[in-house]
């Protein structure tokens, strides 16, 4: 079982915690991580692209000139695809790009992402994270005590408005709850900061 040091909010060591081997101690599967990231990024696409077909562009109800005798190429509508201002053939239409991987693959991807942070020594476990009022400077002080200078993902057991509001204005810092842990967020941030309660909740969900 991987062991990780537990810190308090001031950055002092207060003990150790054993992380679940089946979650934090597995060998990260890069192929599964790739598929999970692609799935999440695909679901983020708006898919609102749209072009007009020949039936939707303005004009073109009348045949521009008679079929024979003009010397020009025969035309049936000024809104055919070959005309300037004509409709587009097989152009993009609104669609959803979202798709889902099998549940077992998604769970393996989350485990692999968490295990990656353990392997890289980029996981920090806090005894607890309590802020009496939403203050950015208090959150900055916590991160400074933990010597976190890069992008950080803070995971709490439950929704905590004071923590969320305190971190909202800090560039590169994101706060999520334990049941919202996902591959893209974990890999996108350099440091993973979890409270002990959040670790226990994640282990309970992924066990």
UniProtKB/Swiss-Prot annotation:
GO terms for cellular component: ribonucleoprotein complex; ribosome. Keywords: Ribonucleoprotein, Ribosomal protein, RNA-binding, rRNA-binding. Residues 60-71 have a biased composition (Basic residues). It comes from the Bacteria. GO terms for biological process: translation. Part of the 50S ribosomal subunit. HAMAP family: Ribosomal_uL4_B. One of the primary rRNA binding proteins, this protein initially binds near the 5'-end of the 23S rRNA. It is important during the early stages of 50S assembly. It makes multiple contacts with different domains of the 23S rRNA in the assembled 50S subunit and ribosome. This is Large ribosomal subunit protein uL4. It comes from Bacillus mycoides (strain KBAB4) (Bacillus weihenstephanensis). The lineage of its organism: Bacteria, Bacillati, Bacillota, Bacilli, Bacillales.
